[in-house]
Structures are given as C-alpha cells and as structure tokens.
Amino acid sequence: MMVTRKHYRYIYLQNSHSLISCFVHFEFPRVWYGAICPCFPSFALLRKIFFCQQQQHATLCAVLRSGLCGNGDIVPMPARREVWVWGVCDLVAMAIARGCGLSPNGCPLLRISHSCRVNKKHERGRTALNSGRSRDVK
C-alpha cells in the first residue's frame, strides 16, 4: 500500500507529567504505525507505537532492543498491542518500517521529518504546548 498525505497527520500533546508526544500515524488495513519526530530537544520525548498484530508487536520490540534505534527503553502493553518507547533516536521510523515489513521507500515521514516547513509547524506546536493546550497541526 502506498502511503499518501491523507494517511498521516502531526499531533502535539502534553500529558500531566509534562512529557511531549509528537508523532505521525500511518493507517494501513491491519496495521497502525506511529513514530515520533524529535523536534522538542528541551523536553523528554514520549514515543507511542500502535500495532494490531502480536507478531508485529514482537518484531518491533526485537528491532528496538537490537540497538538499531538508540538507547530506547521499551514498556510493552500487549493487551492493547501498544508500546511506549523512551529516548530512541530519529532512526526509529526507518528501523520499525523495515523490521515490520513496511517499505520505507516513499514513506512521507522519512522524506519530510527534517524539512524546514515541518520544523516551523513544530515550533507553532511548541507554542501551543507551552501554553498548556493540545494542538493538531494539519
């Protein structure tokens, strides 16, 4: 399945522990995949990745534990096929895409995650977060 713009959006959230989530969702027929763009260096980043199949959940944990994604700490929640990952580097998107059989070729996250246009949107999101509000950047 080709990933197009309609399949993702940027979401900025701030939880009660002042941890920032900034991640992109890709919706496939049987897979939810999310990865975070590390654009808030002054905050601790919380990474949350969703999966619908146990095999993909296990593969994700194996990829992250292999060290390909930096020094991430993994806290799996298998009942909801949900994984919380702390402190992994921005290579997490590519490693997860490859490890779970999603082709990184043509993936919008890999092309635009460091562009000036996206970073400006992240700065606007940071302003919203600092004021205590949640914000979706379209």
Curated annotation (Swiss-Prot):
This is Uncharacterized protein YJL027C.
